[in-house]
């Protein structure tokens, strides 16, 4: 399908405005991190929430931000304190949006998702977001958090028939731990 010539400049302007908005938000969030400025983070986040869903903000802004922060951290441009500061503010937003969903009963009851990180695993931001997405889709979730002893998961089998365990590892578990 051809686009009318008069629509092309409008489309170009929309694309430029969207990229500019994302770039501005990313820069504001990086500045908030560098200055440990929670207020700037919250103002930037609230401004984004006026235009986008939480899922859009996470995918379009937070993920690129975290990718960039990873590079900054690996090159010693930022300290672990900077990374922890911004990660905890993002976690706070995930918790808030997840809690809003938890007031409603799950609509999909055929599966229960149990989310956990194994012992010595502390990087939970991604798992928290998966928990949010599963709850958003109407599933019952049980979030167990970080450094969960794997042998303790067997208890859950007494309570639910169709459990899906969700985890990931950035530390290397032994084969015996996985079995």
Locate predicted features:
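C-terminal regulatory/effector modules of DNA-binding transcriptional regulators
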Residues: 77-179
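Long amphipathic alpha-helical segments
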Residues: 1-102
